Amino acid sequence: MKQSMVFSPTLREVPADAEIKSHQLLLRAGFMRQNASGIYSFLPFGLKVLHKVERIVREEMERAGAVELLMPAMQAAELWQESGRWYSYGSELMRMKDRNAREFALGATHEEVITDLVRDEVKSYKKLPLTLYQIQTKFRDEQRPRFGLLRGREFLMKDAYSFHATQESLDEVYDRLYKAYSNIFARCGLNFRAVIADSGAMGGKDTHEFMVLSDVGEDTIAYSDTSDYAANIEMAPVVATYTKSDEAEKELEKVATPDQKAIEEVSAFLNIEADKCIKSMVFKVDEKLVVVLVRGDHEVNDVKVKNVYGASVVELASHEEVKELLNCEVGSLGPIGVNGDIEIIADHAVASIVNGCSGANEEGFHYVNVNPERDFKVSQYTDLRFIQEGDQSPDGNGTILFARGIEVGHVFKLGTRYSEAMNATFLDENGKTQPLIMGCYGIGVSRTVAAIAEQFNDENGLVWPKAVAPFHVHVIPVNMKSDAQREMGENIYNSLQEQGYEVLLDDRAERAGVKFADADLFGLPVRVTVGKKADEGIVEVKVRATGESEEVKVEELQTYIANILK
């Protein structure tokens, strides 16, 4: 492709609203442009990268036995109502009405549509297992779109769905697609980890996220320093044991703590370590208010609270709800004196506290010498806190460290969550009606492009891995007015294309500095500069990833490039 014919508008300055490298560089290099908040156009170079990621995804999905189809982006509300998610999915689901006031959703995901499709066509175990996938635009009404393609309102996604007669069949396909995902992200050149995850609004049980390691990732990964264990911090269980001291219990005492609300303030004011304080929080679990206790140096994990109750929605109670429930402000909460009708659950660590402190449910006062079970009753002790760095790894090997990650893929064992809700059944080999067993497998295709750009860049621009680069080689005649340089550049361009390489020829009448700056921004793997030594049959070859350059004779160029790109 000749650069003079390409629509690739570059920017010299960093756009003001672009916070992270991938967003900045994809805009500056002319790979995309913003249409509205969280909505982007892919320009020609960006689209070439997107298509290369799509190709890798298709190859690995088909190798794993999945078959491609295409479902509608606009989905009837009745299907979502049938599954129950019309009411539970939340405000991220984009809803609309047609001229006849019939309700629809713009697809954030396609479980309902695919289940409806398959239940009408697959009636026998003889047609199972079946794995179908699509690559299609999805829509989510993000409250705060940010980070360019990493959190948008419109994005390209590959979603696959598998249907099975037995759990063993689901396990087999799940493992196969897990490996396919690992292959996809490895082929894209990414540094990633597969981690144990929460299924969230999707439902189901076993699930893994594929996380690209990056400091700008919105998720925290907890991983072992000596084993392969890795989990989203929300899902990492705490296996610590707590020993109760033999300190004698003291008499409960209420003390004034004026203007001291946070644990750090209270512990400093009372000269008590944070790990002897009891942090009390009120959560709304579906429609029920529950008091949750953790140790003062720990944080409540709301996903674990949700899983304790098998709830659909868990959120912090509002100040007004806390006031109505306990007649106190949030900063004075404590478990002592709470009405017996209100359930109190606590993390395991709370049970070992001796002579601790807690809020007194009265503004400006706390209790000291607090002892669980003597001073208040707990209905259940369980794992309710976030794991911390330095904790024992849940697999028993090593200690936990943290890293940030960008989620680019997610695989779920949905089980019968959707098939039972939507009456999607089949006849088994005994002629009995059974619900279809399902799996679900998603990849953020456009997000993967951003994740690659986030991992592969330097101070000068993008540095694309060969497998996804828009072109393999960038040929730059420095002076297009020079017949020797122009002709040699075109000859190299043509010969490399004949060898199967994708080549970009900078045939613009621009200054050398402009050409080189754009070349660094674009980040193609190999740059061939045709300069003053063209008359001698010599060009300069530069490897973008390493910055290494070498003068090469034209007759040796193809072999030299082949060694770089092998």
UniProtKB/Swiss-Prot annotation:
CDD domains: ProRS-INS (cd04334), ProRS_anticodon_short (cd00861), ProRS_core_prok (cd00779). It is found in: Cytoplasm. GO terms for cellular component: cytosol. GO terms for molecular function: aminoacyl-tRNA deacylase activity; ATP binding; catalytic activity, acting on a protein; proline-tRNA ligase activity; transferase activity. Its main location: cytoplasm. PROSITE patterns: AA_TRNA_LIGASE_II. One of its GO terms (biological process) is prolyl-tRNA aminoacylation. It catalyses: tRNA(Pro) + L-proline + ATP = L-prolyl-tRNA(Pro) + AMP + diphosphate. It is an enzyme of class 6 (ligase). NCBIfam families: PRK09194.1, proS_fam_II. Homodimer. Consists of three domains: the N-terminal catalytic domain, the editing domain and the C-terminal anticodon-binding domain. Belongs to the class-II aminoacyl-tRNA synthetase family. ProS type 1 subfamily. This is Proline--tRNA ligase 1. It comes from Bacillus anthracis. The gene is proS1.
